[in-house]
């Protein structure tokens, strides 16, 4: 009986591991391409987008009308170049600009007539400004928002709206990406419309907020069966973040500016950043299309390697956000062409050697030296090859190495001479043993 149990457990483990690694090979790449111009109909832009695994594109009512195209036609062209890429349409239900731009006038009108703004106190005109400013005012996404004549609150109505306006008319999309899905509100206001101010730090108010987004995404799933739902998960990894309502609700998301900006979580230390990364990943449902987004200069090759190598310690998709043209286009780095294949070791949580972290893949390994660890030399168990690059040839010179020196806050991809393959799961399970 014990032998049977062990064989079954082994088979299940191998099958699950094999399935997990049957998805996109590493390095996995994404882009958060939401900035103007939204010229996704441009053939050159489509070629850029087709090179990555996951793209998030900004769409609005009437997009493509002037070019006599649709988002569906555009996505079809992108997928004709790369059938394995995944494309999501951007929406936001956290706030709305006042006055609304022409594309959003009808949306604003519905919000106004339904009293779906967050108000200072009761149903007056003191709308609450978003912490992003720029005339964006907060919408009441909570379960406590007023219901319309159809018996729906804003969260439910917005789920229907996003599906009807963007999702279902564009079936080639893989799903919807929703921005600013915070784990708690960022402003005080009369969230339950009882004439009193509710604190953003009140756990009850926070639960209303998350439950509202859960209503929203559940509505999206009902309206868009078979599609995936992504969210901005930038603050989900905070140590005090409560994610009860969000657990398994979204299939991926963006860890926006997790590294590279003055306000990035990286500023709290590499270990904190990685714990943040892992906590967000853990809350997502399969296939976990998480985008680890780095902000910075496209010529800071060491910084890019550090971000990419950190990303590769887990299973997210790496996106580089060029400070010269934020959230537009796809910058390409030599490391992106390194075909690492599937991971042959699990996401890494402990240092391998000299404080340096390592993860193994079929066709290579990735090393990352956390900031504050100082310059380190590590010894490899055999011959590995540096990639042959043109952007930083002093590092990526194609040489064979058995020792590697990494600067502080640096990373590197090394290739194997012979690929290492993952074992296939057993074809059958023996169940006859009884001892």
Identify the residue ranges that each predicted region occupies:
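Gram-negative bacterial Sec-dependent N-terminal signal peptides
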Residues: 2-20
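Glycan-processing catalytic domains of CAZymes
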Residues: 22-420
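Intrinsically disordered, low-complexity segments enriched in polar/charged small residues
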Residues: 9-10, 33, 427
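Intrinsically disordered, low-complexity segments enriched in small/polar and acidic residues
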Residues: 427-433
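Intrinsically disordered, low-complexity proline-rich regions
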Residues: 422-426
């Amino acid at each position: 009986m014990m032998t049977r149990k062990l064989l079954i457990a082994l088979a299940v483990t191998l099958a699950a591991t094999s399935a997990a690694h049957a998805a996109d090979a590493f390095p996995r790449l994404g882009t958060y391409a939401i900035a103007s111009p939204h010229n996704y109909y441009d053939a050159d832009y489509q070629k850029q987008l087709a090179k990555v695994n996951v793209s998030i594109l900004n769409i609005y009512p009437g997009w493509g009308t002037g070019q006599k195209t649709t988002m569906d036609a555009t996505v079809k062209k992108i997928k004709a170049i790369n059938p394995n890429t995944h494309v999501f349409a951007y929406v936001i239900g956290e706030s709305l600009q006042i006055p609304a731009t022409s594309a959003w006038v009808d949306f604003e009108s519905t919000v106004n007539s339904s009293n779906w703004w967050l108000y200072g106190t009761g149903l007056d005109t003191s709308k609450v400004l978003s912490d992003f400013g720029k005339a964006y005012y907060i919408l009441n996404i909570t379960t406590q928002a007023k219901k319309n004549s159809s018996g729906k609150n804003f969260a439910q109505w917005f789920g229907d709206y996003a599906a009807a306006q963007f999702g279902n008319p564009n079936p080639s999309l893989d799903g919807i990406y929703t921005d600013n899905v915070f784990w708690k509100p960022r402003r005080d206001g009369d969230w339950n419309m009882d004439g009193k101010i509710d604190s953003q730090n009140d756990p009850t108010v926070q639960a209303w907020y998350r439950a509202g987004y859960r209503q929203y995404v559940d509505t999206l799933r009902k309206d868009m069966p078979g599609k995936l739902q992504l969210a901005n998960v930038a603050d989900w990894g905070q140590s005090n973040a409560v994610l009860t309502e969000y657990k398994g609700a979204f299939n991926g998301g963006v860890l926006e500016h997790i590294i590279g900006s003055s306000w990035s979580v990286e500023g709290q230390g590499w270990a904190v950043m990685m714990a943040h990364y892992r906590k967000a990943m853990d809350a997502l449902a399969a296939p976990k299309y998480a985008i680890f987004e780095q902000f910075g200069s496209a010529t800071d090759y060491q910084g890019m390697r550090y971000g990419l190598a950190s990303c590769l310690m887990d299973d997210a998709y790496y996106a580089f956000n060029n400070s010269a043209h934020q959230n537009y286009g796809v910058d390409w780095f030599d490391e992106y062409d390194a075909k690492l294949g599937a991971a042959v070791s699990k996401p890494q949580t402990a240092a391998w050697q000299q404080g340096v972290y390592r993860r193994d893949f079929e066709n290579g390994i990735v090393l990352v030296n956390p900031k504050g660890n100082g310059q380190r030399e590590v010894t490899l168990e055999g011959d590995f090859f540096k990639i042959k690059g043109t952007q930083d040839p002093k590092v990526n010179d194609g040489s064979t190495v058995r020792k590697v020196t990494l600067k502080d806050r640096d990373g590197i991809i090394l290739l194997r001479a012979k690929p290492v393959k993952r074992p296939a799961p057993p074809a059958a399970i023996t169940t006859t043993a009884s001892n």
